[in-house]
């Protein structure tokens, strides 16, 4: 392809298009104006979504990436514009979400002079990105963009930052598009060791009580089919991490539910009873393991992961299997024998019955006509035929949504797992509607988290984004209040919330809305929400002091889950 002399800003636009980008989220400002001017001429091919705060741009890019499997992109200015994306970048790093953040920067000759809106973005973001690079010359644009996208989406995905100096945006360059599929000294997908695969297969073939822990890595590796073939051949039950919940349908008979502090009783307790523990694309987060000194000490541990740094980081591994789990699972499935573990699988039933009797039935079948959080979640899930994309904020709403929503399709849960970012939900849901416009997107929020990025209702209004917002309003910072009730003597220190009238707020943003306060109002309201074209806000006034159970107490083991407060 012949080279053409264009500006660095124009080269950026063409490079994004060459990478397949069609949607980006951003907010203009001084140091990025030449690039936004170039974007003006590409507005028919690059759909720019104007957010109301740069944090919203980063979270929207995350939501887009999580549901689509593509790289999310955001475009912001220097200084506060760039620093406003930091929380989203950190969130993407810990949750392995591929995004590219392009931020304006002062001209190269002004660097280090404390110029207006100058910050050392590369220095700030190096610990929370896979790669952070400052583009000082227009001739580096095509290479930097190609490298950024390759790094963001290869291996264990994650965020990349491009700090785009203003002089590089206006300089002329002989442009030639570029793609990369190799970087020397960067090995994103290690090849699995055949000896390790054989050792893992031998352990699985001889196991009497195997348990598979399913993480987000299964979805990131597009290994859902391989996972099902693996567990079905050896008849092995599994539990899913928060981010791995939609890697296998909720209805699958070998899926025993969610792992973690507020997960299901069976898979948590059985972690300390299994004889072989097979972790697939998960990182043994502290919310999953509980007290490490007592975690799965009786079991041989097999860990399948693409990232060697996760091996032995939290839990001692007997057999590590490095590589993309799409391939390692397929290889391992060929090596294991067809088996059956009916007695072991049946032993989960007593825990399922106990949890249903003490927790679930009370949550989804209230006796006094008041609304419970889990009841609302289950009703929305069923009304959407369990096919909607679930987005959550952080807090009780997150755990209730994760527990009571059901999943039938992959890439169906978008939530802030590792960082636990309140305010994530609303902008992430906006991104999800652009990433998968063919699917219904439902976001569950608390009254605390909604107000953290409530300005993005303006983005929803402008774009007519069909986000279905379910506000679980309990007039508390509910998760903190629950801890205060259980462990701090019911001293509710600054957790009660005085809330605005959300119906009036929705009206101001031209978003149809409805408030429900009783069980008998719920079904009609959900039907109205799901059949309304465009966005909708459903405010469910739930009981104020509801608690998320079961719960592993702080410092406790996974087999010490509390069923009541």
In which residue ranges do the predicted regions lie?
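Generic enzyme active-site microenvironment
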Residues: 161, 303, 391, 444-445
């Amino acid at each position: 392809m012949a080279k053409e002399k264009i500006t660095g800003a124009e080269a950026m636009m063409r490079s994004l298009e060459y990478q397949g980008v069609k949607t980006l989220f951003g907010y203009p400002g001084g140091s990025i104006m030449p690039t936004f001017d170039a974007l003006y001429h590409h507005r028919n091919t690059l759909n720019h979504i104007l957010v109301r705060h740069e944090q919203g741009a980063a979270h929207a890019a995350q939501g887009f990436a999580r549901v689509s499997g593509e790289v999310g992109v955001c475009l912001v200015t220097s200084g506060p514009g760039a620093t406003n994306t930091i929380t989203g970048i950190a969130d993407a790093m810990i949750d392995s979400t591929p995004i590219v953040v392009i931020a304006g920067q002062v001209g190269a000759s002004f660097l280090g002079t404390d110029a207006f809106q100058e910050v050392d973005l590369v220095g700030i973001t190096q610990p929370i990105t896979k790669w952070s690079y400052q583009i000082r010359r227009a001739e580096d644009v095509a290479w930097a963009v190609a490298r950024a996208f390759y790094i963001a989406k290869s291996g264990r995905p994650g965020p990349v930052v491009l700090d785009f100096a203003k002089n590089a945006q206006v300089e002329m360059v002989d442009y030639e598009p570029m793609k990369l599929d190799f970087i020397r000294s960067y090995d994103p997908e290690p090849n699995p060791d055949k000896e390790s695969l054989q050792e893992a297969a031998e352990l699985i073939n001889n196991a009497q009580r195997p348990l598979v822990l399913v993480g987000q890595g299964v979805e990131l590796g597009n290994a859902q089919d391989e996972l099902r073939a693996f567990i079905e051949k050896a008849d092995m039950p599994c539990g899913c991490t928060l981010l791995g919940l939609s890697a296998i349908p909720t209805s699958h008979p070998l899926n025993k539910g969610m792992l973690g502090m507020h997960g299901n009783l069976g898979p948590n307790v059985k972690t300390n009873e299994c004889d072989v523990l097979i972790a697939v694309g998960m990182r043994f987060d502290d919310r999953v393991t509980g007290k490490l000194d007592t975690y799965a000490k009786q079991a041989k541990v097999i860990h399948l992961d693409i990232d060697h740094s996760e091996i032995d980081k939290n839990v001692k591994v007997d057999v590590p299997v490095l590589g993309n789990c799409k391939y390692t699972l397929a290889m391992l499935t060929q090596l294991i024998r067809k088996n059956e573990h009916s007695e072991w699988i049946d032993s989960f039933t007593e825990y399922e019955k106990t949890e249903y009797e003490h927790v679930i039935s009370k949550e989804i079948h209230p006796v006094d006509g008041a609304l419970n959080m889990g009841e609302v979640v289950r009703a929305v899930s069923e009304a959407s035929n369990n096919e909607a994309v679930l987005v959550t904020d952080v807090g009780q709403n997150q755990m209730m949504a994760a527990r009571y929503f059901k999943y039938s399709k992959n890439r169906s849960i978008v939530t802030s797992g590792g960082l636990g970012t309140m305010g994530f939900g609303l902008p992430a849901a906006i991104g999800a509607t652009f990433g998968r416009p063919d699917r219904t997107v439902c976001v569950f929020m608390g009254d605390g988290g909604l107000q953290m990025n409530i300005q993005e209702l303006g983005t929803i209004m402008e774009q007519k984004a069909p986000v279905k917002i379910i506000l679980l309003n309990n007039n508390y910072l509910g998760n903190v209040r629950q801890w205060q009730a259980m462990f701090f003597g019911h001293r509710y220190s600054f957790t009660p919330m005085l809330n605005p009238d959300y119906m009036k707020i929705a009206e101001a943003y031209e978003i149809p809305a409805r408030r429900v306060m009783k069980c008998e109002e719920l079904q009609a309201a959900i039907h109205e929400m799901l059949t309304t074209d465009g966005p909708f806000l459903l405010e469910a006034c739930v009981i104020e002091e509801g608690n998320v159970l079961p719960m592993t107490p702080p410092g406790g083991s996974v087999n010490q889950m509390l069923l009541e407060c």
